[in-house]
UniProtKB/Swiss-Prot annotation:
Protein name according to UniProt: GTP 3',8-cyclase
Taxonomic lineage from the root: Bacteria, Pseudomonadati, Pseudomonadota, Gammaproteobacteria, Pasteurellales
GO molecular function: 4 iron, 4 sulfur cluster binding; cyclic pyranopterin monophosphate synthase activity; GTP 3',8'-cyclase activity; GTP binding; metal ion binding; S-adenosyl-L-methionine binding
Catalysed reaction equations from the record: GTP + AH2 + S-adenosyl-L-methionine = (8S)-3',8-cyclo-7,8-dihydroguanosine 5'-triphosphate + 5'-deoxyadenosine + L-methionine + A + H(+)
InterPro entries reported in the protein's UniProt record: Aldolase_TIM, Elp3/MiaA/NifB-like_rSAM, MoaA, MoaA_NifB_PqqE_Fe-S-bd_CS, MoaA_twitch, MoCo_biosynth_MoaA/MoaC, rSAM
Annotated residues for binding of S-adenosyl-L-methionine: Y42, G83, S134, M205
Gene: moaA
Cofactor: [4Fe-4S] cluster
Pathway membership: Cofactor biosynthesis; molybdopterin biosynthesis
Binding annotation for [4Fe-4S] cluster 1: C36, C40, C43
Homology family: Belongs to the radical SAM superfamily. MoaA family.
Gene3D superfamilies in the cross-refs: Aldolase class I
Length: 340
């Protein structure tokens, strides 16, 4: 009888997903839909446009098989993304299914917060452990200008409700833009002074459909970092499983600032995540190839060994870093199809 090793939470030596550069992948970003109800000017300014051919997004059974296989290979955290994942009618069932997967210890959700005020208690009940909410402005008119939706107050109430329900820290994402976010830095700092929010400023990335927007709105995260350092904020040491964000803290603030700067040297050195699209394609990099189809190996439980072998084999082709610094964003026209 073959002995089955007991996995210890957080032990990277037990991860089977390792690339040629000895990076270990314990984190899966799983998109469950490409549909989004916001029209953010930096992502989908014209709104979601369905493709001419009919698409089928991963169903509940396929997601269950996928999560189980990744967990068996050492994945401990799954982030559910979109589009806007909470638009799926079976969203709660999906979360509950993943939460019942042995080996998965964290289930994070990236959402625009559209349904948060109403549904956060349900999300918590089915197993959402971590939250990332997109809030690109704290000014209602500016927020509507950026997103196409007048939902800021509801989203902010949803965040407060999450704290009331016991969430200890919430990550809030804002895309760093010259005309918008940068001008509101003082507002964001005041907001997090007495709230345990990690306010993450994500540097605008150049994608195929948004070249002109990038040229007019891109602002280096270093600009923000230098200001914060001058005001007494201090860079925090990174833990082994931390992502690419550079986190700053200040003794007078309950919240933190996170800066995600993909154009920085060595940005990819700490990569620990793989992505699967809503249509079942494995993406080794946010700015990479067309993706490797996995759906033919999600038809039955008996295919798990073949699926695991395909994942491990594909990982050996992962590049050491992206090529954004030379203007190559791969095939990515926008980030809505894979959730960033």
């Amino acid at each position: 009888m073959q002995a089955i090793p007991i996995k210890t939470i957080g032990d990277p030596s037990l991860c089977d997903l390792v690339d040629r550069f000895q990076r270990q992948y314990t984190y899966l970003r799983l998109s469950i839909t490409e549909v989004c109800n916001f029209r953010c000017n930096y992502c989908l300014p014209d709104g979601y446009r369905p493709p001419s051919h009919k698409q089928r997004f991963l169903n509940l059974v396929e997601i269950k098989r996928l999560a189980r296989t990744f967990a068996n290979l050492g994945t401990e955290k799954i982030r559910i993304t979109g589009g806007e994942p909470t638009l799926r009618k079976d969203f709660l069932e999906i979360v509950e299914t993943i939460s019942q997967t042995e080996g998965i210890h964290k289930i994070a959700l990236t959402t625009n917060g559209y349904r948060m005020e109403r549904d956060i208690h349900l999300w918590q009940q089915v197993g959402i452990t971590d939250l990332n909410i997109s809030v690109d402005s704290l000014d209602p008119r500016q927020f509507q200008l950026i997103t196409g939706e007048n939902k800021l107050q509801s989203i902010l109430k949803g965040i407060d409700r999450a704290f009331e329900l016991g969430y200890k820290k919430i990550k809030v994402n804002a895309v760093l833009m010259k005309q918008y976010t940068a001008a509101e830095l003082d507002k964001f700092l005041a907001w997090i002074k007495h709230k345990p929010i990690q306010m993450r400023f994500i540097e605008l990335m150049e994608t195929g459909e948004m070249d002109n927007f990038f040229k007019t709105q891109h602002l280096s995260g270093q600009t923000v970092m230098q200001r914060l350092l001058a005001e007494g904020w201090r860079l925090q040491p990174k833990a082994v499983n931390d992502g690419p964000a550079k986190v700053l803290a200040h003794p007078d603030y309950q919240g933190e600032i996170g800066l995600i700067m993909p154009y920085e040297k060595n940005f990819c050195a700490s990569c620990n995540r793989l992505r699967v699209s809503a249509t079942g394609k494995l993406h080794l990099c946010l700015f990479g190839e067309e993706g490797l189809d996995l759906r033919d190996l999600l038809l039955s439980d008996e295919q798990q060994p073949q699926l695991a072998a395909r994942l491990k084999s594909a990982l050996q082709t992962k590049r050491e870093h992206h090529y954004l610094h030379i203007g190559n964003s791969g095939i990515r026209n926008n980030l809505a199809s894979i959730g960033g």
